[in-house]
């Protein structure tokens, strides 16, 4: 059986990379409020990890309306599902420890070495290669020119000169791992001390960050894909949302 877990702090936890990571209160609240989100994409016969107190009635209503073949699993019940295949929103050392402590068999969880490889694949820096590919092949309706990776040995002085020379309209710095609108530093008024401090922290903590122009965007959306783990990748839909910036 598959057990789905909604952990919206997944990318932030990857940035921290510690098994005892604790997300900010607002993100923890989001995880609680949206714990049943996986019922809409879980495979039939699966379980969804969520507190029962205020989720059971809602799930029952949705099951009646949409004939959803999923059931609720609470944290205290995890030992009864020790042999499940955990399907989190995203893997990181913290969710691995949480599942292991809850009673899931270790053989059903990714190894620390596998998590290290997963972390590197999840970094924003990997997206730069795709952007460059789209740009070099002149694929219509894509952007990517002007985006770059700043690494630890570059220093903030080089970053400052790069901004002055290339980003007349300002730029945005992005942590290699972050989520829910976190990990961004907007540089609209020059390389100020606050911007410099942010860059220094990012270089110290993650040894790099992504820098890109502030695009004249129309709206925000993400493309969602599913990988079966055997080389097959499927496009499953869009995630459209609204942001302040």
Predicted regions and their residues:
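N-terminal-proximal low-complexity accessory segments that begin disordered
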Residues: 1-47
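A structural signal for short, well-ordered beta-strand segments and their strand-loop junctions
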Residues: 4-5, 48-51, 87-90, 172-174, ...
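Conserved N-proximal alpha/beta basic substrate-recognition cap immediately N-terminal to
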Residues: 27-41, 49-159, 178-179
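Extended, Lys/Arg-enriched charged tracts that mediate electrostatic binding to polyanionic substrates
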Residues: 65, 161, 176-182, 188, ...
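Short acidic/polar capping segments at secondary-structure boundaries
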Residues: 93-94, 176-180, 215-217, 243-244
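Glycine-rich phosphate-binding loop of ATP-grasp-fold ATP-dependent ligases
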Residues: 146, 170-195, 222, 245
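A short acidic-Thr-Gly-centered motif at the start of a beta-strand
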Residues: 157-169, 202-203
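Phosphate-binding site of ATP-dependent enzymes
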Residues: 195-244
């Amino acid at each position: 059986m598959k057990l789905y877990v909604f952990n919206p702090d997944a990318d932030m936890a990857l940035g921290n990379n510690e098994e005892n990571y604790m997300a900010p209160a607002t993100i923890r609240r989001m995880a609680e409020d949206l714990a049943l989100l996986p019922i809409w994409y879980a495979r039939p016969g699966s379980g969804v990890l969520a507190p029962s107190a205020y989720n059971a009635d809602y799930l029952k209503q949705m099951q009646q309306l949409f004939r959803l073949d999923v059931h609720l699993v609470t944290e205290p019940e995890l030992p009864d599902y020790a042999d499940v295949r955990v399907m989190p929103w995203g893997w990181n050392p913290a969710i691995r420890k949480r599942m292991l402590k809850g009673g899931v068999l270790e053989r059903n969880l990714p190894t620390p070495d596998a998590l290290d490889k997963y972390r590197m694949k999840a970094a924003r820096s990997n997206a730069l290669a795709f952007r460059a590919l789209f740009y070099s092949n002149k694929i219509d309706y894509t952007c990517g020119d002007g985006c770059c990776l700043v690494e630890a040995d570059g220093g903030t002085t080089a970053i400052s000169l790069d901004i002055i020379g290339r980003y007349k309209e300002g730029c945005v710095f992005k942590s290699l791992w972050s989520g829910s609108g976190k990990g961004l530093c907007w540089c609209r008024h020059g390389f100020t001390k606050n911007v410099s401090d942010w860059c220094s922290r990012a270089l110290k903590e993650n040894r790099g960050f992504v820098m890109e122009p502030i695009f004249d965007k129309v709206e925000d959306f993400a493309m969602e894909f599913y990988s079966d783990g055997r080389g097959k990748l499927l496009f499953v839909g869009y995630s459209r949302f609204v942001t302040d910036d």
